[in-house]
Every structure is written in C-alpha cells, then in structure tokens.
Amino acid sequence: MNKLELMKTANEVRKGIVTAVHSAKSGHPGGSLSAADIYTYLYFEEMNIDPKDPKKADRDRFVLSKGHTAPGYYSTLAHRGFFPVEDLTTLRKVGSYLQGHPDMKHIPGVDMSSGSLGQGISAAVGMALAAKMDQADYRTSISQLLIARPMLLHKGHILADLRDICSLLQ
C-alpha cells in the first residue's frame, strides 16, 4: 500500500471505532483513535499475517496489552478481513464475541487475551523468546501504555538479543 492508501484505510478503521463505541454506548474511543495509524501500518503493511489462516505458525504476533482500546484493535482486525466489519456494531453486547477486552479463544486474529495493564509485556517477551528458542521466523509487537515511565528503545528492541519485539508507546 502507498501512503495515501494507508491513510484512507486508517480513516476507515477510525470510522469503525466510532461506530463500535457508539453502538455499545460505552468504551474508550480516545486511545483507540490515537492508535489507528499504528495498527493500520502494522496490520496492512508490516506484519506477516493471513486472515484466512489466523493461527498460521509462522505469522507475526501482536499483543494488545492495553485491552481497553479493544475497539481500535477490533476495527483493524475487521478491516483486515479477520471477521465482518458489520460485527463491530455488536461490541459489548450480550452474546457478542467482541467484548470489552480481546479474548484469544473467541476472536480470530487475537494472539493474546488482554487483562491488567502491563501483563502484555511478559506475554510478548515470552512469545519472542519462544520464537528465538524454536528458531522461528516470526516477530512480536506490543501496544502498551506505560504511565509516566517512558521506555527507551534501541532500534525497536526492548531487551538485547530478543528477536524483533518492539513496544508501541502512546
């Protein structure tokens, strides 16, 4: 995709966020809207993923540690083709698979369920270490909110010798 196409896609992701949060009459639109460009770039340009085979062994992984921004994550996954965009209107409804925090057992494309802030770093580091130990060729990315503690990154790596794990800070 060229830059203009990515910008248009990010705007569609934003529309999906607003639609989902409005339909649910609850949610955290600010964090989701601010992450739309990052999620769009990762899912449409950078990550090795296949919506038709979301559990493919050599796919890149993504961990949404700040699960309350799930509407942005869901909109990105829907626009990438993991599930129908129309399902965004079911956010937080009884019986919907799109609840307040992502659940890896029920949502196609979700690699890790989200819970308490900060838990995603350990999960992402574990995934990156597993890839290194297995000599696998996938990368792990994480969206993490760090309150009043900015993290210094060196070329996208949090810890030395872990394969391709980066933290996206907002």
PLM feature segments, named:
Residues 141, 169-170:
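Hydrophobic/aromatic beta-strand patches that form the interior of the parallel beta-sheet core
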Residues 10-26:
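N-terminal capping segment at the start of a domain
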Residues 29:
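Histidine-centered catalytic micro-motifs
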